[in-house]
Amino acid sequence: AYVDSPDITTYTELHNSWLEAYINWQYVEMFNIGKAEEIMFFSKTNTYPVNEGRIQENINNEKTDLSNPNDWSCQGFPGLDYMIHGIADSENEIINQYIQNPLNGKYLKVVINELNDNTDLVLNDWNTYRNTFVNSVENTATSAFNMLTNDFVYYFEKGLRTNKIGIPSGVFSNNPLSNKVEAYYSSKNGIEDVSRDLIENALNAVDPVSYTHLR
């Protein structure tokens, strides 16, 4: 609706849908197994910070194939954050960008469709893979249980503590790096400051018992 009729009402609806989906993502991001691992779902869905210059090139070139690893930072929830909140400095200016340049709307659709298609692949595969996964409890490197455990530990240390908290807060540098948070553009341009909300949901998604053992 927004691409066909960009105004403040459809813009707000788009923002709210993006935020709801991004919050939900926090609860599944650590499960990088099966089809998700095969298609690099984690990287395609939540690589940040985005590559602004490459996104603009993709827009101008009307690019529709985002399978190149160099385009991981041009799609997913961070890519949508830029397209919804970052191509100008205010809601009205952003809406005008879509009115004046239809290529922005075309690329927004490409990013949304890519995310939806990848999600469908993972969900459809899970419907057939679930029983195999549940019954795979052997103590081997390729058993589902061990893979799940290893992926969870990796996510906890790298995806959560390092990427979501450590790097933006400046733990690994002399100063905080605010541009390396999730939802950077929504917060930066005053649309809605949701970066903290995403981190809090990511922490809530981590099982308290596992957190106690891993910290």
Language model regions located:
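N-terminal mature-domain "stem" immediately C-terminal to a signal peptide or N-terminal signal-anchor/transmembrane
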Residues: A1-D4
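N-terminal secretory/targeting leader peptides
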Residues: I8-Y11
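Acidic/His-rich structured neighborhood in mature extracellular/periplasmic domains
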Residues: A21-A183
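Glycine- and acidic
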Residues: Y185-N189
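Long, repeat-rich segments with strong aromatic
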Residues: E192-N204, P208
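Conserved small/polar residues in nucleotide/adenosyl-binding loops
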Residues: T212-H213
